[in-house]
Each structure stands twice: as structure tokens, then as C-alpha cells.
């Protein structure tokens, strides 16, 4: 049984979120939650929310036991980029890219 949860349009770049996702892939759910709880990265908070949601989905929809769940797959895809302008000296302007990402977590029983 596999259960998934998604967070779409998360306000972090996919590159930064993938650093966190790579740390928990394939781990038991309890160990993954510990790692995410104590990680100093902003993306860890977002990934933890999605993991909690996937666990709740498995419990509620499939009747799964939390102790037997592991992180089956975690992947982060790029979302749309918001483009903004930053005024600079002498009438110039720089483009600011505010990147978003789509975080997907799949939990499966061992």
C-alpha cells in the first residue's frame, strides 16, 4: 500500500528542498520525522508538513499502522517562478526570481 501527499506551490526553490528530501528518502517514518524536526532548514518544515499529511492519510484512509510505515519516495519538482523587478542605480533594474516547488511524499508499509 502506498499513500501520497503533495504540497504544491511551496515558496522555496526546488534545489533547496531537494537537499532535505534526499536526507529522508527510504527511512522509517519515525526516523524521518526526527531528522526533519531538528533540521535548521526552512524546507525541512515544509517537507515535515507533507510527511505528517501523508502519515495521516495512511492512518485515516488505509488504516495503516504508523510503526510499519517508511518513506517510500520523496521528490521535489519545480513550480512556476514569480518574476519581480528590483530597481538599481542609474535607472537600471534587476530581475528577481521567486521560485516555487511542488513537494510530493509517498509513504509505504514495509
UniProtKB/Swiss-Prot annotation:
GO molecular function: rRNA binding; structural constituent of ribosome
Keywords: Ribonucleoprotein, Ribosomal protein, RNA-binding, rRNA-binding
InterPro entries xrefs: Ribosomal_uL22 (IPR001063), Ribosomal_uL22_bac/chlpt-type (IPR005727), Ribosomal_uL22_bac/org-type (IPR047867), Ribosomal_uL22_CS (IPR018260), Ribosomal_uL22_sf (IPR036394)
Gene Ontology BP term (one): translation
Database matches in PROSITE patterns: RIBOSOMAL_L22
Keyword rRNA processing: no
Complexes and interactors: Part of the 50S ribosomal subunit.
Matching HAMAP family: Ribosomal_uL22_B
Family as reported in the entry's similarity comment: Belongs to the universal ribosomal protein uL22 family.
Name of the protein in its database record: Large ribosomal subunit protein uL22
Species this protein is from: Shewanella frigidimarina (strain NCIMB 400)
Amino acid at each position: 500500500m502506498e499513500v501520497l501527499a503533495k504540497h504544491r506551490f511551496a515558496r522555496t526553490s526546488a534545489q533547496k528542498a531537494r537537499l532535505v528530501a534526499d536526507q529522508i528518502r527510504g527511512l522509517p517514518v519515525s526516523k524521518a520525522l526526527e531528522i526533519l524536526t531538528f533540521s535548521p532548514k526552512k524546507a525541512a518544515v515544509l517537507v515535515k508538513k507533507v510527511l505528517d499529511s501523508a502519515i495521516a492519510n495512511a492512518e485515516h484512509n488505509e488504516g495503516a499502522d504508523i510503526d510499519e510505515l517508511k518513506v517510500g519516495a520523496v521528490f521535489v519538482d519545480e513550480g512556476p517562478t514569480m518574476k519581480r523587478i528590483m530597481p538599481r542605480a542609474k535607472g537600471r533594474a534587476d530581475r528577481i526570481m521567486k521560485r516555487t516547488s511542488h513537494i510530493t511524499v509517498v509513504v509505504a508499509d514495509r
